């Protein structure tokens, strides 16, 4: 038996108006983004933990996608090290908080064998990504599937792109 959670969380808050300048964002923008991008995913993972723990097969390798896994959709713009553009405060900050929550969860769940990590799907040509995005949905999905199928213990607590490259925190 195996279980996997891929919580694809690409909600558009106020038609993605969170790409506002510092002088235009509100505390409500920040709070709403934090609730959607960090609080919701973390508490969903917490509620599903009993099922995930029950799905771990001790006879199989730990931290394997064919075991229990919590893989949250993040974004490269949440990388503190790679932030050279600034702005996007609500989205960037709330996804950085999600990354911290996933890193902490990976530490807390290490002994369970449940794989925990954050993944960036890429800048995808969707309603959110727009027409200037770098990849189409087929490239995104096929890359993510390939990456997911290759995950091992070394990826526990990682932050990866859809093409299996590491993103610095």
Question: Where are the model-predicted features located?
Answer:
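Hydrophobic structural elements of the Rossmann-like NAD(P)H-binding subdomain
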Residues: 8, 71, 116-119, 129
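C-terminal helical subdomain
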Residues: 118-121, 130-169
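Short-chain dehydrogenase/reductase
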Residues: 45, 102, 141-144
